[in-house]
Regions:
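Acidic (Asp/Glu)-rich catalytic clusters
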Residues: 242-245, 268-277, 358, 405-409
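Short, flexible, mixed-charge acidic loops at enzyme active sites
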Residues: 293-301, 307, 466-473
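Structural recognition of the beta-strand scaffold that forms the well-ordered cores
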Residues: 106-108, 138-139, 251-254, 390, ...
């Protein structure tokens, strides 16, 4: 509940207005609203309470317009695969977890990253089944786009390769036997099946507990509004029912009932339950994560091959070369292309998007590679959704791609928090200087509204960490990834506050008179890694 008293926060550094700017001073709040902002020396005298912040910073309430909130909530209660360093580690961990769990329970691991293994080779289905001993086992990697599953888990999810929209989402050997690696739709079906089985087994109180625990963690991280990029109707209903029990504002995009990656349809619209905190939206996936739809000059591919060869020689292992050729690469129109578009026919995409646009939905699109981003732009220019649109990721774009996208009016939701983890992979691809990675500055220059989001738990879910990486572009070794794409602290803070609202289809003008008193107090400059959020306020109430 909002504090009804007049409270003046003084002796602060205030990041206020739109566009955001800094000033020494503070602000006065009352009844859940900002009454005034003031410079140092002009503090109001007619207040019930005055809080001296001693030079701390006040920033607008932080948002995350792309955070897998419900999956993250479940992951906190299950096994962590991030420490695995080999296939044997994976199989040993699966075997041990299966020994210690009742036979009917799921065994779930997340955050696997086999690209960091000395020998980046995943277990086969036969090996997973041997370790699982007849149990339902599911392992998701860091992207939530690829995973491993036992035969029992696949059977429980009703997986059938030929019934998938993209049969290639279940890998096979040359002889047609299943390899055990699942992608996109197949991965999503097992994930949603497991999620329902797990939370239903524990009942309503457990469902509330895991959601409220995750909401509390978000508030502690200074988040005031979180948007889940895709939920089915039963989980939408769950969040809608729990919303009154947390001050964290929750919203979501509509997905199919079966999984996140298949295009939603008429039935998903009919059964949808929408948030009170954002316009209704629907999610379409145009490519994957590792399996992205992208192209680059042949010269970039040659650079990548040379580097992979040299790395393999210097490290005395085949890992770098194995990872390079893990994906299908074809020569098309004089460019090296990763041919992983989910919609081979753009007219099918236009038809599906038009249905939801005519129903008043905001269109949200996953497009990680530049080919997918251009397809998204062409679809949006044709459909022109009245509810607006957001396109997420756009990890690598050419200048020409950015020009095409700028004509759509859509928000670009980018995740610079991935820079420390993925900069090396981008450079190993030979993408620079032919493509712009995380092209925040280039998008801004072309007038594209930008949002900074996390894609948590796939990337860092700390909103200030993500904003900082947009400013400094730091890799793990301290050097910068394409420094020309740096943006200013004010631009970054705007992207993780007002930009987040724009991506969700809402409006936030920042800390200005008349606006909701939703803000965070930071111990120091928010762009110093040593600074931390010490208070979070939503609509005039301190929630952390």
């Amino acid at each position: 509940m909002a504090d009804s008293r007049d409270i003046a926060f003084k002796n602060a550094v205030l990041w206020w207005g739109s566009p955001i700017r800094k000033m020494q001073g503070g602000m006065k709040i009352s009844g859940g609203k900002i009454v005034s902002v003031f410079e140092k020396g002009q503090e109001p005298s007619d207040v019930h309470d005055a809080v001296d912040l001693g030079g701390r910073h006040i920033i607008p309430g932080l948002t995350d317009a792309h955070r897998h909130f419900c999956v993250t909530a479940l992951m906190a209660r299950h096994e962590d695969a991030s420490t695995w360093k080999s296939k044997q580690d994976a199989l040993d961990a699966i075997r041990e977890a299966c020994r210690s769990r009742p036979r009917e329970e799921w065994v779930f691991f997340s955050r696997m990253d086999h690209t960091k293994w000395l020998k980046p080779v995943l277990p086969t289905l036969a090996e997973v089944d041997s370790a699982a001993s007849g149990r339902k086992v599911f392992v998701s990697d860091t992207t939530l786009h690829r995973g491993l599953a036992s035969s029992e888990a696949m059977e429980r999810a009703g997986l059938d390769r030929q019934s998938l929209r993209c049969p290639g989402d279940m890998d096979t050997f040359l002889n047609g036997r299943l390899r055990g690696t699942l992608w996109e739709e197949a991965h999503g079906k097992v994930l949603f099946t497991m999620y329902r089985d797990v939370i239903d087994a524990y009942g309503d109180s457990y469902k509330r507990e895991i959601i409220l625990d995750e909401a509390k963690r978000c508030l502690q991280m200074s988040l005031t509004h979180v948007h889940d990029p895709g939920l089915p109707c039963d989980i939408q209903t769950l969040l809608k029912g729990i919303q009154p029990q947390t001050p964290l504002k929750l919203s979501w995009s509509v997905s199919t009932h079966e999984n996140l990656y298949t295009p939603p349809g008429v039935e998903d619209d009919a059964k949808a339950v929408h948030s009170d905190h954002a316009p209704k939206s629907v999610k379409f996936f145009l490519d994957g994560a590792h399996r992205t739809a992208a192209s680059m000059p042949v010269a970039a591919g040659l650079k990548a091959m040379v580097r992979a060869g040299l790395d393999s020689l210097s490290e005395r292992r085949l890992g770098p070369l194995q990872l390079l050729f893990e994906q299908k690469i074809v020569l098309k129109d004089g460019k090296l292309t990763l041919p992983y578009l989910r919609f081979q026919d753009i007219n099918e995409l236009k038809t599906k998007a038009s249905y939801f646009s005519e129903k008043g939905y905001r269109i949200v699109v996953h497009a990680l590679g530049n080919i997918a981003a251009v397809q998204a732009a062409r679809m949006l220019k044709a459909v022109r959704p009245a509810g607006g649109a957001s396109v997420e990721h756009m990890l690598i774009l050419t200048r020409e791609d950015i020009d095409v996208f700028a004509e759509t009016g859509a928000v670009a939701s980018i995740q610079p928090g991935f820079i420390p983890d993925y900069a090396d992979a981008i450079e190993r691809m030979g993408a620079i200087p032919y493509l712009k990675p995380f092209p925040l500055k280039s998008l801004l220059k072309r007038g594209v509204p930008i949002c900074i989001s996390s894609d948590g738990p796939c990337g860092s879910d700390d909103p200030l960490f993500n904003a900082r990486r947009a400013v400094d572009r730091k890799k793990t070794d301290g050097t910068m990834l394409d420094p020309d794409e740096r943006i200013s602290p004010e631009e970054a803070l705007s992207a993780v506050t007002a930009g987040g609202h724009a991506s969700m289809g809402t409006r936030n003008d920042g800390l200005v008179p008349g606006a909701p008193a939703t803000f965070c107090i930071v111990s120091g400059d928010p762009f110093l890694d040593s600074s931390r959020v010490i208070e979070t306020w939503i609509d005039g109430a301190k929630v952390f």
